[in-house]
């Protein structure tokens, strides 16, 4: 009787298969645990919301024709997209006290590892505030998302968060912070203060002050040669709470660095350009007198070249940044373009899009884009008090 020996290659393949099965089982456990805890928490005392979904965005007055564009139908689609986002991407941490937006799975040695990024986490915070309804459990979810960020400090900047974390490890490696993600986190904290007033586990004001000062310190220490996202919308919101000349200086420096890219490139924009165009669009919607006019011509020119691409939304433009995320980032600027046929086509493409299983960022950007097109986005201050949109 002959026995075939196992080669090193066979052993490696077998171990990889075992690792993949272990990841699947672990993920299944996390999903079931998340669903069970959600059911339990739905029975707890709910949190009142000061701005329950849906609200009417202040920028609707700038877009009179858009105001009449099927608000109820779009809200129904948005609610469904939000439910799918919550089901497909939000998971509880191992301790049950944290929550994270699951992203790509990476292979480390013979093991497959779940990951989450601080940018996706920051957007999840923002979405939780925007979609909160009176009496739901959004505040508890917000606190768990925030707890995850606080539990994964960045390298050399412990008050900020590591740009990438590995939620299913007892200890996750400390990596550098994503400063653009940090700005989204700060904006979400401000919105949470307006929505709920306070949190049960954390002092919103203390967390905001500590992180905003840490972001200032990180910006001062970062190399001028490092590519940064142009963030006039977010930095303006932060500057209103933490005055410092650096916010304006940083905004101008980032704009000068972005201009050559906007002039040269074609097709859907890559990560830096797309996130910057999103910021320009949001600035134009909420703060049209804050310098949008001087940036609009170049931004609209880039937008037209981006929207000329009618390729399918599946796949990535660059590692970790999908075509869906890129197109979604263009939407607020497209609203200001005031071409109804363009926005109608964008709504059709986004509402029918199916985010890839590991594309948490694309799924979150899609939700943000759909909120802007539904006209329900609101800010914490310095905008006209919105009138709730009926969904009856």
Model-derived features: where do they sit?
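Long, repeat-rich segments with strong aromatic
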Residues: 248-341
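Extracytoplasmic mature domains of secreted/periplasmic and thylakoid-lumen proteins
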Residues: 165, 178-191, 197-227
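Alpha-helical transmembrane segments
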Residues: 24-32
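Low-complexity, Ser/Thr/Pro/Gly-enriched N-terminal "stalk/linker" regions
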Residues: 41-119, 130, 134-172, 214, ...
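Aromatic-rich carbohydrate-recognition surfaces in CAZymes
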Residues: 114-124, 172-197, 270, 363
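C-terminal functional modules
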Residues: 321-390
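Short, strongly hydrophobic alpha-helical membrane anchors
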Residues: 1-11
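Well-ordered alpha-helical scaffold segments within catalytic/enzyme domains
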Residues: 56-71, 122-137, 184-201, 230-243, ...
